[in-house]
């Protein structure tokens, strides 16, 4: 393994490939992409004891096509992907030890369907639990999971967050 590579769980990450991937993402998404240090720091801060490690760039996804296109590009270059919701990160999951692309899902915050009789709701990953419960208030339904912070549904799902309720 060269100085330009990192390995974890049998996967090798090449810094040159990651930089090429980030360049391609930047070209494709333009203003939806940022590689500013302050934005990258905001997207790597965790509530754990571990030191934050920054992604190489952040994509502010607006829809599932943005996510799909970014994932395809990252796959071509074997570039790590770090999904980002609200960013409370009690689990340290937004840390980027190998760099890569943080995909911010906050703009994907629509409640798509409420099937009251079936007790079923379809949401985008950026919807927060407070947003969902406000929307459901007049239906007699509520989302009982409460991890303490106003976490996104996508973040809660990805980390199995359950809270105290």
Predicted regions and their residues:
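N-terminal flexible segment immediately upstream of the FAD-binding catalytic core
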Residues: 1-72, 88-119
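FAD-binding glycine-rich core of flavoenzymes that anchor FAD
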Residues: 64-165
């Amino acid at each position: 393994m060269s100085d330009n590579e990192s390995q974890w769980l049998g996967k090798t990450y090449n810094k040159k490939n990651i930089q090429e991937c980030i360049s391609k993402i930047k070209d494709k998404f333009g203003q939806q992409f940022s590689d500013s240090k302050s934005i990258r720091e905001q997207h790597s801060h965790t509530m754990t004891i571990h030191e934050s490690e920054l992604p190489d760039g952040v994509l502010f996804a607006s829809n599932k096509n943005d996510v799909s296109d970014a994932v395809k590009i990252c796959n071509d270059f074997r570039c790590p992907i770090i999904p980002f919701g609200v960013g409370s990160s009690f689990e340290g999951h937004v840390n980027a030890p190998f760099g890569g692309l943080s995909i911010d899902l906050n703009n994907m915050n629509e409640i798509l369907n409420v099937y009251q009789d079936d007790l079923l709701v379809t949401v985008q990953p950026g919807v927060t639990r407070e947003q969902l419960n406000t929307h459901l208030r007049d239906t007699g339904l509520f989302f009982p999971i409460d991890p303490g912070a106003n976490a996104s549904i996508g973040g809660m799902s990805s980390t199995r967050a359950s809270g105290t309720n």
